[in-house]
């Protein structure tokens, strides 16, 4: 899909508010449809006037006027893209509208992203493919003085989509093919050509670093664990670094605290945190952001074998802190503990964001709408929230009262890796906080938002790419301060 500035295009998209009095460009048809209750202008509603007409257009509902947001525009244009594919439309034209509550840049970005998101599908293993993308050219009728801004916004949106689609593809890949080594090679292949330095460390180096918690989780698998370190240097005049740490469980059986079959089926998605940081790094590098970002992924599988770690074990970590294993299915926090300490002790990051499909408790609390968050720094949290709002990927902050720390204190080790059912999403985050020292840090629990069991707006079933956009906008605003 290519975007152009101009008024060409085979089919025009006409925007309609819910229950609008009239539609200038198609009022007779709209009045008829409204009277017959065939089209009301609900958000994402589409009426096609394409098949038997020289004046080809679609009516696209954008909902109630006062409720128009960047995200609602994404949803509407996603639906428009899907509808146009059914008719194999190859080119479209859109007059960029103005909304009092939205910046022009945000409007263009939302329209662009909505259309691009409509092209995504994961059909690699289907012998019969579904409807293929057909829109080759999109013509945008814009204000002349906004031309440069529009072109820049389109390019940035396309870079973001590249990162999002990469993340989605990595997560949707079944675990039989997406092993830790394959994940590492994907990071290398996708990022090195963009100027990102990618280093991959195997078991011996991981052991040398003292990452015993990470290694403990991987002991039950035949697949070798991989530490993936991606370094993007966008500002040579600064030594400030933002670290993105992604959970990289390419498959999680639960270990000896084994999951039921129904809970295992989608556990190839337990590396969504790692996929999001790889995707974000791609978008950051493609856009040449003037910022220094280091992404870290501790990739492994959590499996069962004679050598696997067990409930009741006490293990050490790169930080030196010891951990009692009460539940082998609380493994992500163990791999992250060492990856976070690597960000602190080796990378010496100035700010850290970790992203993980960490707890079912977060899904219970927030469902698939909001990403859960916990922090040790309110200023950084505010920046994450602003980035998430810009991205249309809402974040909800959990409390971090010191009293919760009592729930993760160990009896025979410094910490325990599970606090039971009580405040599970919070205590998991508090556990991670033990491995960041005084470095400003935010934990994002994407257990409910990174992978969907059913369609939600412009996000289809399966991997969503959340929170690639949030990480990108956070990095964009970081500016090495």
UniProtKB/Swiss-Prot annotation:
Binding site for Mn(2+) 2: 247, 252, 270, 331
GO cellular component labels: cytoplasm
Residues noted as binding Mn(2+) 1 in the record, renumbered to the chain: 252, 329, 331
GO biological process: proteolysis
Active site per UniProt: 259, 333
Cofactor binding note from Swiss-Prot or TrEMBL: Binds 2 manganese ions per subunit.
Protein family membership: Belongs to the peptidase M17 family.
Protein name: Probable cytosol aminopeptidase
Gene name for this UniProt entry: pepA
């Amino acid at each position: 899909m290519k975007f152009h500035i101009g008024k060409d295009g085979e089919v025009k998209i006409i925007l309609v508010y819910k229950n609008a009095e009239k539609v200038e460009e198609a009022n007779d048809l709209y009045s008829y449809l409204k009277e017959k209750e065939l089209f009301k202008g609900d958000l994402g509603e589409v009426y096609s006037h394409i098949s038997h007409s020289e004046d080809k257009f679609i009516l696209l509902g954008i909902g109630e006027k006062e409720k128009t947001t960047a995200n609602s525009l994404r949803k509407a244009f996603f639906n428009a893209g899907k509808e146009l594919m059914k008719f194999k439309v190859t080119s479209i034209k859109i007059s960029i509208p103005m909304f009092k509550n939205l910046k022009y840049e945000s409007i263009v970005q939302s329209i662009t992203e909505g259309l691009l998101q409509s092209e995504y599908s994961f059909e690699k293993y289907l012998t019969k493919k579904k409807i293929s993308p057909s829109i080759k050219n999109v013509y945008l009728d814009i204000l002349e003085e906004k031309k440069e801004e529009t072109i820049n916004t389109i390019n940035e949106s396309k870079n973001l989509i590249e990162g999002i689609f990469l993340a989605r593809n990595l997560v949707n890949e079944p675990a039989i093919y997406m092993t830790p080594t394959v994940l590492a090679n994907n990071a290398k292949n996708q990022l090195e050509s963009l100027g990102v330095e990618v280093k991959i460390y195997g078991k011996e180096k991981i052991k040398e670093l003292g990452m015993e918690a990470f290694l403990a989780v991987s002991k039950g698998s035949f697949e070798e664990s991989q530490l993936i370190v991606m370094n993007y240097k966008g500002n040579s005049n600064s030594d400030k670094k933002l670290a993105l740490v992604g959970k990289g469980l390419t498959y999680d059986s639960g270990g000896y605290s084994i999951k039921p079959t129904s809970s295992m089926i989608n556990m190839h998605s337990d590396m969504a945190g790692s996929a999001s940081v790889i995707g974000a790094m791609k978008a950051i590098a493609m856009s040449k952001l003037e910022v220094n970002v280091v992404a870290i992924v501790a990739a492994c599988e959590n499996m069962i074998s004679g050598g696997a770690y067990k409930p009741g074990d006490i293990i050490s970590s790169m930080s030196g802190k010891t951990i009692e294993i009460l539940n082998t299915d609380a493994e992500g926090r163990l791999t992250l503990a060492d990856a976070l300490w690597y960000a602190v002790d080796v990378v010496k990051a100035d700010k850290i964001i970790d992203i993980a499909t960490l707890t079912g408790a977060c899904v219970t609390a927030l469902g698939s709408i909001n990403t859960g968050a916990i922090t040790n720094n309110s200023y950084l949290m505010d920046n994450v929230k602003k980035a998430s709002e810009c991205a249309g990927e809402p974040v909800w902050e959990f409390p971090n009262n010191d009293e919760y720390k009592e729930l993760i204190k160990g009896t025979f080790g410094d910490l325990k890796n599970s606090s039971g059912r009580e405040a599970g999403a919070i205590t998991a985050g508090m556990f991670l906080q033990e491995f960041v020292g005084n470095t400003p840090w935010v934990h994002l629990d994407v257990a409910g938002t990174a992978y969907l069991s059913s369609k939600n707006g412009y996000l289809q079933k399966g991997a969503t790419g959340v929170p690639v956009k949030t990480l990108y906008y956070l990095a964009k605003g970081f500016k090495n301060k």
